Structure formats: C-alpha cells, structure tokens
Amino acid sequence: MPQTLHVHSRVKDYDILFTDHVLKTLADCLGERKQRKLLFITDQTVYHLYQTLFEEFAQQYNAFVHVCPPGGQSKSLERVSAIYDQLIAENFSKKDMIITIGGGVVGDLGGFVAATYYRGIPYIQIPTTLLSQVDSSIGGKVGVHFKGLTNMIGSIYPPEAIIISTTFLETLPQREFSCGISEMLKIGFIHDRPLFQQLRDFQKETDKQGLERLIYQSISNKKRIVEQDEFENGLRMSLNFGHTLGHAIESLCHHDFYHHGEAIAIGMVVDAKLAVSKRLLPKEDLDSLLQVFERYQLPTTLERADVSATSLFDVFKTDKKNSEQHIIFILPTETGFTTLAINKDDHQFVEKLDSLL
C-alpha cells in the first residue's frame, strides 16, 4: 500500500500519510515547527488509552493538551470557547499549531478552532477511529453543532496533513468499528460496488491486511470526489446519502443515543426505500444493504418512539443541503445517485416518511 496520498484543494493541498509510527511521522510533518507551541486536542477516552503517547509528546515538544468529554455534545461553541481560553492563556500565535488526536468529534472541533483562531492557524489531524480515518478527517469540513442542530456552524478548512495509523483501531470497540464500516458502505454503495461487495464479505478477525486495503480504497474514493467537488456543488453531494435523515435523528436524540454511523445507516435504508419506491433502485440492492447492515449490527429502523416523522420533517427544514423551498435527499440508483427535492410544505411526505421508518 502506498505510504502517501496527495489531496489537491482549492484552499490548500495536503497529504494523507499512512504509518505504523505516529511519533516519527508527526516529527517529519512538523519539520521546523517542532519548536513552536502545539496544542493537542483529544477526548478522555483516547487520552486514557494512549497516555504514554501523550507523555512522549510532552517530552519532545512544547506541548499542551486539551481533553474533552467523549461524545457529540463536545462539538459545541461552549467547548470551542474553552479551547480559545487555553490558547489565549498560553499565548498561542498564528505560527503555532493544533493537533487533533481522536475521532470525528475531536477532528471537527479542533479543525473549527484552528479555522477561526486568529482567522486560521495550522493544524494536523490524527484520526483514531475507523469512521474518522475513512470519512470525517478527509475533505476539510470542520464545525460544531448549534442549538441541537448537527454541524450548523462550520467551514472548509483543510489540515496541513492527516496521519492514518490502523494500530489505533486495535482498541476500538466493535460498535465504533461498525460505525466506520457504515460510512465505507455508503461510499461503496454509491460509487464503488466492488468495495461494497468486499465489505460485505470481509472477515475482520482474520484479515488485518485486508482491512488496510479497504481503508485505503475508501479514502481513495473520497479523495477523488472532494478533489472534483470540494465545496459540495455536485458530486460531493452524493456523500450525503443517508445524511438528511441521519443528521435529523442525531439532532432529535441530542447526539448521544445513536452514534453517527448508526444514524446514517438508518438514513441510508430510508433513502434506499425511497429509491425503490420510485423505481430508481432494484429491490435486490435494498435487500443487500439491509443484509450487510445486519451483519455489522447496524440499525435499520428507528427505535425511538419519541422521534416522529413530523419532528424529523421539522428538523429537515434546517438542513444545509436545502434550497430555499426544498428539502434535498440523496437517493441511490442502479448506476450512482440522484437528488430528490421535497417541498418544505409537502405534508403528504410526512406520511410517506412515517411508513418507511
């Protein structure tokens, strides 16, 4: 497997570096910046699992650490403010750097702080979950939730580099592993059916090298897409398959009942059912999706009686993908994807949605 993928960005190019030696790779990335101040942003789970690694950071660099509570509720302006306070207290300048080491929440949060502190300081991502390695760290999207709404405030702000080490996945709980598989299945189902089929048949326990190949293949797909459409005006919209409903579920469940990959799995099933109902997708493809989600213990139906189709529809109206009058869904087709525009006043769609959940 190649050690580096180079990502072209209209904002700033960056490298995705594959390694088993995080400390050495980070040192190589920093270069002359080794003498600058570094703020490592992480969460309590990662900090306790890899405390020795953070101790080595402290020995080698002028390093500070900010440790967040785990979970989606840390993606908040309150947490951003706390990190700003630490940066100001330690007199961080535009030439100093943030390094995120954690899952998607930590990466999105730290990237947003980097994008906005002094109108932008450099940062490096070290994603530690499967989902963050194959999806959220790539493409420059950073942001936080606001008033319960998912990723409501954010920007496109690429990192200096992304360091991928599959050794972090050895401590990843099965639930989090399945959430990462969910995003890999998403990109495979829309853009790379051979990848989808390989994931369907993959045996995690006996094929570590196979996992590395699948991760590389998933990342390569996302790299290709974001290079063609960095600001989500066309092709990159396809990566929102499952996300209109998934983000609404996360918002209504306060970002703590379902993990991101689980909410997106439910969203993908509903999008696929819509596609089947419009004869855009063969029912056999929907059945295949349901089977592979079941294999990875991903939910396929909404299990919260307090979350109704009506409440979901109200949250849809705040989605970033919307046009002025329409809610946008991404539907899979036999050969790719298409968009479905639902009028914001179409209450008949609420009944349709209720039948699909």
From Swiss-Prot:
Pathway: Metabolic intermediate biosynthesis; chorismate biosynthesis; chorismate from D-erythrose 4-phosphate and phosphoenolpyruvate: step 2/7. Its cofactor is NAD(+); Co(2+); Zn(2+). It catalyses: 7-phospho-2-dehydro-3-deoxy-D-arabino-heptonate = 3-dehydroquinate + phosphate. GO terms for molecular function: 3-dehydroquinate synthase activity; metal ion binding; nucleotide binding. Its EC number is 4.2.3.4. Zn(2+) binds at E183, H243, H260. One of its GO terms (cellular component) is cytoplasm. Binds 1 divalent metal cation per subunit. Can use either Co(2+) or Zn(2+). It is an enzyme of class 4 (lyase). Keywords: Amino-acid biosynthesis, Aromatic amino acid biosynthesis, Cobalt, Cytoplasm, Lyase, Metal-binding, NAD, Nucleotide-binding, Zinc. Belongs to the sugar phosphate cyclases superfamily. Dehydroquinate synthase family. Catalyzes the conversion of 3-deoxy-D-arabino-heptulosonate 7-phosphate (DAHP) to dehydroquinate (DHQ). This is 3-dehydroquinate synthase.
